[in-house]
Amino acid sequence: MNPRYRFILRFYSSKKPTFHNTAPSKTNVNVPRANKSQSKGKHKGKLLVLVGTLALVTSVISVNYQKNEPVEFLE
């Protein structure tokens, strides 16, 4: 095994896992938290629309530029 990878394995194996109690004391642990997953879905949808719009605008600008000033390739 490469010494570099041995160091990485040793580094990660030396860390001890830490468990944090994030639930309040009088909460049922088996009930899923729906509000966090919904907010992530909303942000993901907005980000997807933003990236799609940006890609479309960039493509239109590129096509228009190629029509007006075509690039001459060197041979």
Curated annotation (Swiss-Prot):
Pfam families hit by this protein: YKL023C-A
Transmembrane segments: 47-66
Chain residue ranges for the region called Disordered: 19-42
Membrane topology, as annotated: Single-pass membrane protein
Record bears the keyword DNA repair: no
UniProt KW keywords: Membrane, Transmembrane, Transmembrane helix
Domain of life: Eukaryota
Bias (Polar residues): 19-38
Cellular compartments per GO CC: membrane
Subcellular location: Membrane
Protein name as it appears in the record: Uncharacterized protein YKL023C-A
UniProt organism field: Saccharomyces cerevisiae (strain ATCC 204508 / S288c)
